[in-house]
Amino acid sequence: MNILITGATGFVGQALCRELVNIYRFQTIFAAIRPENSTTSLPLPIKPIIINSLRDLSENQEVLAQLDCIIHLAARVHQMRDTTPDPLAAFRAINTTATAQLAQAAAQVGVKRFIYLSSIKVNGEHTRPGQPFTAKDIPHPQDPYGISKAEAEIQLRQIGDRTGLEVVIIRPPLIYGPGVKANFHSLMTWVDRGLPLPLGAIPNRRSLVALPNLVDLMITCLTHPAAPNQTFLVSDNHDLSTPELLKTMARALGKPSRLIPIPIPWLQALTTLVGKPNLAQRLCSSLQVDIRPTQHRLGWTPPVSISDAMAITAQDFQRQKNRPKGSPQFNP
């Protein structure tokens, strides 16, 4: 089987490349990367394809014609401080239009399967108690990123219906693992410093997915006969409250968890005072996903527990923290 990975030098892409090389003996694995990422080391025998944009890849029929499957990870990602004049147009250009163009070009030259890493933001931003998101829910994206992903899903399904391209859509919630950045990294930094956190009284439930579990599902979908033309939600199948998450982090880091229980309205007022009114919503709301259909259809279960996944995440966090400034990064 010949496959191509877009976004191969990203957080998810690097982990996927390593696992593909370690476990599977594909004839050829291509990785589409941008020139500025060309120095990022990829495991052998992955073959890099340098592209300036996804359009370059869509027009490269010589490469596409060799492929059995594309795993499409490349995307314009969610940004907390987006200064783009028209964020929705910027997200659509890459996440919707360029994705559809790539899938259409792939279908025209006979690529069999197209695995698309979407987002749980297609479903929405939060769930009510006892009502986890499912793949059958009516999409309700709340921001430009989620809208662009939802529209891409629609176009991919239409392309699949017209051409016979086997489309597989995966919607992950928050992904964590070695190399994680953004909010999850910030939480780990706070816990590692032993800072008292006013988050001890939050009764929410949140689904997460460890990077190795997400990678395992994507690899399962490469060849599984029941995967085509399906949408799969994924998680660790072990939902946590925010206090439970922080305690799990603390154990993995070998640090005490200093959680102060304060009423949620106080927390909301506090985050507003520091200029981050939406932070309390993200910390206090619930977001749960139902992965039972994924498990039943694919016979799949997350292979790595939350405690083990958090341990390897913490080990990488400590390694990066202790790395001398200016030295090259290496993700084992």
Predicted features, each with a name:
Residues 3-24:
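N-terminal Rossmann NAD(P)H-binding glycine-rich loop of SDR-like oxidoreductase domains
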Residues 51-97, 101, 105-108, 125:
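NAD(P)H-binding glycine-rich loop region in Rossmannoid oxidoreductase-like domains
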Residues 100-144:
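Conserved Rossmann-fold NAD(P)-dependent oxidoreductase catalytic core, especially the SDR/UDP-sugar
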Residues 140-168:
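Active-site Tyr-X1-5-Lys
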Residues 177, 199-204, 232-239, 250-254, ...:
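Glycine-rich Rossmann NAD(P)(H)-binding loop
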Residues 180-186, 200-223, 229-233:
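Substrate-positioning beta->alpha
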Residues 211, 270-301:
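Conserved C-terminal active-site "lid" loop/helix of NAD(P)H-dependent oxidoreductases
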Residues 220, 224-279, 307, 311-314, ...:
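Mid/C-terminal beta-alpha module of Rossmann-like enzyme folds, strongest
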